[in-house]
């Protein structure tokens, strides 16, 4: 256990194009091997494509997609006596946003479209409409928490 306490959260700068911290977080999640300009090109291209498909502000579409992907409950392992129980716990808001972005980017990487821009754009559009693999992941997480509701009294 560190004696200094938790490291302070570093401030997140707003995105220069859309002026949104969510877009900055999305760029950082897409980022691989330090290639930030490539990550920005992918995210901006995907948001432009989402704008072309919907005709609305892409940041609003992204927020709607994240609201459909953010988990409310998750399960955490808790060892009690010799058994390990999956205990359902509520997800903190910052963690739910991080998980939603991670799932959105992860499942867009697994899609079949040709370029990453198309994959990310289509996953964002699917998620904003309540479809897609990332929304299914949220439903599975909630189902798991519901199935293990009997162990909710082990919360910490």
Curated annotation (Swiss-Prot):
InterPro entries: Ribosomal_uS7 (IPR000235), Ribosomal_uS7_bac/org-type (IPR005717), Ribosomal_uS7_CS (IPR020606), Ribosomal_uS7_dom (IPR023798), Ribosomal_uS7_dom_sf (IPR036823). It holds the Pfam family Ribosomal_S7. One of its GO terms (biological process) is translation. Signal peptide: none annotated. Keywords: Ribonucleoprotein, Ribosomal protein, RNA-binding, rRNA-binding, tRNA-binding. PROSITE patterns: RIBOSOMAL_S7. Gene3D superfamilies: Ribosomal protein S7 domain (1.10.455.10). It comes from the Bacteria. GO terms for molecular function: rRNA binding; structural constituent of ribosome; tRNA binding. One of its GO terms (cellular component) is small ribosomal subunit. Belongs to the universal ribosomal protein uS7 family. PANTHER family: RIBOSOMAL PROTEIN S7 (PTHR11205). Part of the 30S ribosomal subunit. Contacts proteins S9 and S11. One of the primary rRNA binding proteins, it binds directly to 16S rRNA where it nucleates assembly of the head domain of the 30S subunit. Is located at the subunit interface close to the decoding center, probably blocks exit of the E-site tRNA. This is Small ribosomal subunit protein uS7. It comes from Mycobacterium ulcerans (strain Agy99). The gene is rpsG.
